[in-house]
Regions:
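Helix-loop junctions on the cytosolic side of multi-pass membrane transporters
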Residues: 73-86, 278-289
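Juxtamembrane intracellular "pre-TM" segments in multi-pass secondary transporters
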Residues: 79-107, 293-295
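Structural signature of the two symmetry-related core transmembrane helices
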Residues: 63, 171-185
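Short amphipathic helix-loop junctions that connect adjacent transmembrane helices
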Residues: 123-140
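Paired small-residue
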Residues: 194-202
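Pair of pore-lining "gating" transmembrane helices in MFS-fold secondary transporters
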Residues: 102-119, 201
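Helix-to-loop junctions at the C-terminal end of transmembrane segments
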Residues: 156-168
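Cytoplasmic helix-loop-helix junction between adjacent transmembrane helices
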Residues: 1-35
């Protein structure tokens, strides 16, 4: 699982190194849409395969799929010449990526956003059961409620990439974060299941813009030879959030109503977007994550 987790940062690094600079937003949006689609379809196909064959066979099929992906990347994906990258790296002064202010903020943002996602995961089945008034078919219903966010993400991710290209990736990030915060808090208001699912779908439309914008800013703020490292750091920050989120959510559920956990998932993003807005570069030149200033 650890080796497989490195596939996504590597794919992002290859994409960022090959796509023209002016199209990076759309590329990141499409990548995020593809990942979201996989997140929606994966559990569906996994469950279907387990029913048709067996759980053990599902692992073999998943491993075979990864092997096919490896072969496709090995033979059909070509990286830029490494010699040019080495010369560029030798010509510039080596700087730790973690010392670059914009990188620090984007890593913080990635970690906190991932924390808010996983914060709700431990309580979601119980909360959905509370909304529908019973625990009947709770696994199936929970899967549907989770999948609506994925569906909206597939629709909206490429559009957010285009918005970032047109108006700037940082403004797109602030807008997506603010929208996700608002809709995340609104999700805690309904007392029945259908309105809750509808608000999750709407929130997914804004959430879809967060990670493409983060990845685009990181791409524009780092030299090509550091793309692999920066996306590895970004993914590591997300995994830290993935560890902390369920612990916080489960701990809160022991003492507070489940609605409080759902509400907090959106509320946490408000101070984050305020902080990012306050710390933003004050000149338009840097709104796209210009590597000239790295602020």
């Amino acid at each position: 699982q650890g080796f497989a987790s490195g596939l996504w940062p590597a794919c992002l690094a290859i994409m960022a190194s090959t796509v023209p600079r002016e199209r990076i937003g759309l590329a990141m949006g499409i990548m995020q849409g593809g990942m979201t689609a996989g997140g929606v379809l994966g559990p569906f196909f996994g469950g279907a395969l387990a029913e048709l064959f067996s759980m053990r066979m599902t692992f073999f099929i998943g491993g075979a799929a990864l092997a096919v992906i490896t072969l496709l990347i090995l033979f059909f994906i070509h990286e830029p010449p490494r010699k040019e990258q080495k010369k560029a790296a030798a010509a510039r002064e080596k700087t730790s990526l973690l010392k670059i202010p914009v990188v620090q903020r984007m890593l913080l943002c990635a970690g906190v956003v991932q924390l808010t996602i996983l914060l709700q995961q431990p309580v979601m089945p119980m909360y959905i059961g509370e909304l529908q008034g019973s625990m009947d078919r709770i696994v199936f219903v929970t899967g549907i409620v989770f999948s609506v966010v994925g569906v909206s993400g597939v629709i909206a991710s490429p559009l957010w990439g285009v918005i970032g290209q047109k108006w700037g990736y940082r403004p797109a990030l602030y807008t997506a974060l603010a929208g996700t915060a608002c809709f995340g808090m609104i999700q805690a208001i309904p007392d029945t299941l259908v309105p809750f699912a509808v608000w999750r779908f709407i929130g997914g439309l804004t959430f879809a813009g967060i990670f493409p914008a983060i990845n685009a800013v990181l791409t524009m703020s780092t030299p090509p030879e550091d793309r692999g490292r920066i996306f590895g750091l970004s993914y590591a920050a997300q995994q830290v959030g993935s560890v902390i989120g369920p612990l916080v959510g489960g701990g809160m559920a022991m003492y507070l109503p489940l609605k409080s956990v759902i509400f907090l998932g959106g509320f946490i993003l408000l101070p984050l977007v305020i902080f990012l807005w306050y710390m933003r570069p004050k000149n338009e030149e840097n709104s796209h994550g210009s590597p000239a200033q790295l602020r």
